[in-house]
Amino acid sequence: MIAIIDYGVGNLFSLLSSFKRIGADAVVTSDKEMIEKADKIILPGVGAFQDAAKKLRESGLGEVVKKQAQNGKPLMGICLGMQLLFEKSFEYGEHEGLGLLKGKVVPIKGAVDPSLKIPQIGWNGLHFTRSHPLFKYIQEGDHAYFVHSYYATDCEDSLLATTEYGKELTAAVAQGNVMGCQFHPEKSGEVGLRILRGFCELE
């Protein structure tokens, strides 16, 4: 069973629907016991890093997710959920993340040509830095759907894929059982479903 963490951030039911479409057993939950019993965990998220980190901390869900990941359970963060896996974010100040991956989250603005629209919204290509079972069903250059104004950097240890938007931006990361996608698999059509299938098949 896959636990999609419900901590009041993000459209969780489109994600749940995507898992159902590929025949996966997934639930949206904030129940700590259910998260502990799950085989895999999805940490979704949209919005501000500070607010999401606060909700995870105050609900105690952040600690549960972190402990499960440290025990070896497959965990995938999506969009803001991926950013929360890192040590810190510089979104409107400096805020601590879960610290499961080395790196930080910084604004796209100032790092790319000022003529580019921020946030990056829309389809963009994925360029792999290495092979990984998460991407076993997709190909180099396949397109995924992005909506973000911040990106992960200083994350060479976990970098899995980049996308080009004025410069190379982190699109996906993976280190051991912890992984993340900056894009939204649930909004990325067949490519997104194939990525979720790859996640479901991880040991």
Show where each model-derived region lies:
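N-terminal beta1-alpha1 ligand-phosphate binding loop
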Residues: I2-A24, E186-K187
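Short gly/ser/thr-rich secondary-structure transition/capping motifs
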Residues: R21-V28, L56-S59, W123-T129, T162-E164
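Short acidic low-complexity segments
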Residues: A26-K37
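Structural motif
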Residues: I42-P44
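Cysteine-nucleophile active-site neighborhood
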Residues: G47-Q120
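Pocket-forming structural segment of enzyme catalytic cores
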Residues: K88-Y165
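C-terminal and late-domain segments of enzyme folds
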Residues: Y151-E203
